[in-house]
Amino acid sequence: MNKRPRDEPSSSFASAPKRQYGAGGGGYGGHGYSEERSSARRVADHYSARSNQTLEERENSPIIHLKKLNNWIKSVLIQLYAHPGDCVLDLACGKGGDLIKWDKAKVGYYVGVDIAEGSIKDCMTRYNGDTDQQRRKKFSFPARLICADCYEARLDEHLYEDAPFDICSCQFALHYSWSTEARARQALANVSALLRPGGVFIGTMPDANVIIKRLRETDGMEFGNGVYWISFGEEYAEKKFPASRPFGIKYKFHLEDAVDCPEWVVPFHLFKLLAEEYDLELVLTKNFHEFVHEYLQKPEFAELMRRLGALGDGRQDQSTLSQDEWEVAYLYLAFVLRKRGQPPSQRRANNANRGKMFLTENDIDFLGV
């Protein structure tokens, strides 16, 4: 695996105004409110429709080593920034794929939010230990699950008794909020309102610098390899993206055995500026290639990589990440933000009172979905 140099911010994304990026905080490129609701629903339906895979099916995936690499990156982020007893807010939690990671971090309370009803029910099943791919051991923390569009709903109105949270996570999903300025702002407003001062926001999302660079390097409007492709519409034929209109830059993304739906470009330096308006300061941002090369130098994370098997286990399993999968990894970055302010001297003790150790469908809160 060769480490690629970090792409510099694209000049066409430079010098954006800090505050308002257009009238009324709405969308761009013709994306109106009803269309954005429709796009959010399409994304939700796509992920809900994906069935839970058995371990055998998962191991036979054409991108199994990429999935293991992604899990390693998320595990490293959680190990670096979560602490025993932490209260966790997991935005776009999906089917609960990170529950075991949080359990290993010995967190004290977990709230998962996802727009897809099918996914949140699968998350409940996984939490209860009822799937054939999960251990039978119970999780050590109480949990609460909410079915809601976390880029539209005011989550603080529903979670004020659960807050504040010590850590918030949004994995491979925050870019879906950048369809409009209003949704992007609501996403960050939710994080800021629910995190305690000094709390951290960890996440992963597409690296806009890499995606735009790839687009400009290709002759047409589509690029990819044997396991993925990205396609931009003809409205971007000039391959220019004015900094004054950073929202609603849509592309189609297909990844074998994983994703097949519209996504949105997130110019990261503008994301950083927007986050600062919500008292969220950047702590870390690294492209996945840079992240892997840096944290593989630490023995505990190298051992974790061996156990997960993204690069083989160093013993019988000699299979490893393909070049195509490694190229997909280059499309993503990891980030960490911290909420301004001094953390409280004493941890609030009653966050977890609303959680349960066993969940039924009646326990799932549905907020306007």
Curated annotation (Swiss-Prot):
Compositional bias per record (Gly residues), positions renumbered to this chain: 22-32
Molecular function via GO: mRNA 5'-cap (guanine-N7-)-methyltransferase activity; RNA binding
Biological role: mRNA-capping methyltransferase that methylates the N7 position of the added guanosine to the 5'-cap structure of mRNAs. Binds RNA containing 5'-terminal GpppC.
Keyword entries, A-Z: Methyltransferase, mRNA capping, mRNA processing, Nucleus, RNA-binding, S-adenosyl-L-methionine, Transferase
InterPro entries the UniProt entry points to: mRNA_G-N7_MeTrfase_dom (IPR004971), mRNA_G-N7_MeTrfase_euk (IPR016899), RG7MT1 (IPR039753), SAM-dependent_MTases_sf (IPR029063)
The protein's name in its UniProt record: mRNA cap guanine-N(7) methyltransferase 1
Region Disordered: start-end pairs: 1-55
GO biological process: 7-methylguanosine mRNA capping
Listed Basic and acidic residues bias regions: 33-48
Top-tier EC class: transferase
Annotated S-adenosyl-L-methionine binding sites: K74, A92, D114, D149, C150, Q171, F172, A173
Sites annotated mRNA cap binding: K95, K101, R126, H175, E263, Y332
Residues involved in mRNA binding: N70, N71
Keyword Methyltransferase tagged: yes
Keyword Transferase: yes
Gene3D superfamilies in the record: Vaccinia Virus protein VP39
EC number annotated for this UniProt entry: 2.1.1.56
Compartment(s): Nucleus
Annotated catalysed reactions: a 5'-end (5'-triphosphoguanosine)-ribonucleoside in mRNA + S-adenosyl-L-methionine = a 5'-end (N(7)-methyl 5'-triphosphoguanosine)-ribonucleoside in mRNA + S-adenosyl-L-homocysteine
Domain mRNA cap 0 methyltransferase: 61-340
Source species: Oryza sativa subsp. japonica
